């Protein structure tokens, strides 16, 4: 009899445990609670790879008839629509879907388009990548590089050739042109470097101004509208190759370590079958002459991990006190 009572108690305990587990899992599912780290509450990161997971609810997966693709808004969108034309056609053939290149004028517009579901595949610039990942559900998987794995660009602080400025220390008391607050080389990296290496802080030691894009800053210094600017040298080199500016008329007073370039990726809820084909399009694309001429520092797309390749950029954000509030 005593043994029967013990068995009954044991069964009762098992039933209670099962009920508790079922109830708690139901609550988690219904409230959308999950591990997400620094990601916005709209996303989950159960595998802790620092990017948004594919939704467990398949009804939230997106399988568009037309894939919308955009490139980071660093220069004239019309120029880049032509440069990316061959790739767009290759992606269309690989995925079996219509692909449209969607030009954007600024980082904010690109981020909002991804967050709202209007973008499926995109290239976000170095500084915007962590913001796009945390606030817009962007999942980067590729970057331009050489066959041997080399990649990247540097931040440069430039002046006109005949400027009296020869060192960042001489920025004090002057106006420095940044590009936009989300840009790595156009704002975040130089801010951290100027503060850490030269004890120069915007508003306290110099006046900051924002041009909007790297080409605006470069042309601003070139034409004398800005005295000093921090820019991505990859953009500078492309403008020189296209004959937009003459290299001899500008001078570099500071050059940073190498940073990762634009990260290419997809919306977190894009159907996995489509994602696989999109990745295939990137990794199998044979670069045409226009592409090689424009992106001369690289010759292929390589696989990347946001957690690894963007570690230095997240550290720069931390040094600048940047938090991904996703407002």
Question: Residues of each region from the PLM?
Answer:
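Periplasmic-binding protein-like
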Residues: 72-73, 147-156, 183-185, 244-316
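Ligand-binding "clamshell"
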Residues: 132-144, 239-253
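Bacterial N-terminal signal peptides
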Residues: 14-23
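Bilobed "Venus flytrap"/periplasmic-binding protein-like clamshell domains
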Residues: 69-92, 127, 150-219, 226-228, ...
């Amino acid at each position: 009899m005593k043994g029967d009572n013990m068995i009954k108690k044991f069964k009762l305990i098992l039933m209670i445990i099962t009920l508790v587990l079922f109830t708690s899992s139901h609550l988690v599912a219904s409230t959308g609670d999950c591990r997400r780290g620094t990601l916005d509450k709209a996303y989950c990161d159960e595998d802790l790879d620092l990017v948004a997971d594919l939704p467990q609810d398949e009804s939230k997966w997106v399988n568009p008839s037309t894939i919308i693709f955009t490139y980071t808004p660093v220069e004239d969108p019309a120029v880049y629509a032509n440069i990316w034309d061959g790739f767009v056609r290759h992606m269309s053939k690989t995925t079996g879907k219509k692909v449209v290149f969607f030009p954007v004028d600024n980082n904010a517009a690109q981020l909002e388009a991804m967050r709202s579901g209007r973008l499926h595949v995109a290239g976000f610039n170095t500084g915007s990548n962590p913001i796009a990942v945390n606030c817009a559900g962007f999942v980067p998987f590729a970057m331009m590089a050489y066959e041997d794995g080399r990649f990247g660009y540097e931040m440069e602080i430039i002046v006109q050739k005949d400027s009296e400025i020869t060192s960042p220390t001489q920025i004090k008391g002057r106006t420095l042109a940044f590009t936009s607050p989300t840009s790595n080389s156009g704002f975040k990296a130089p801010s951290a470097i100027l503060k850490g290496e030269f004890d120069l802080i915007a508003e306290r030691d110099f006046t900051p101004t924002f041009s909007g894009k790297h080409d605006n800053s470069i042309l601003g210094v070139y034409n004398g509208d800005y005295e000093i600017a921090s820019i991505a040298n990859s953009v500078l080199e492309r403008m020189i190759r296209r004959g937009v500016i003459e290299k001899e008329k500008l001078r570099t007073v500071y050059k940073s370590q190498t940073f990762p370039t634009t990260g290419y990726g997809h919306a977190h809820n894009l159907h996995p079958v489509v994602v696989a084909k999109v990745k295939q399009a990137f990794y199998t694309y044979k670069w045409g002459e226009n592409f090689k001429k424009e992106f001369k520092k690289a010759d292929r797309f390589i696989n990347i991990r946001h957690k690894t390749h963007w570690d230095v950029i997240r550290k720069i954000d931390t040094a600048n006190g940047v938090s991904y509030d996703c407002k």
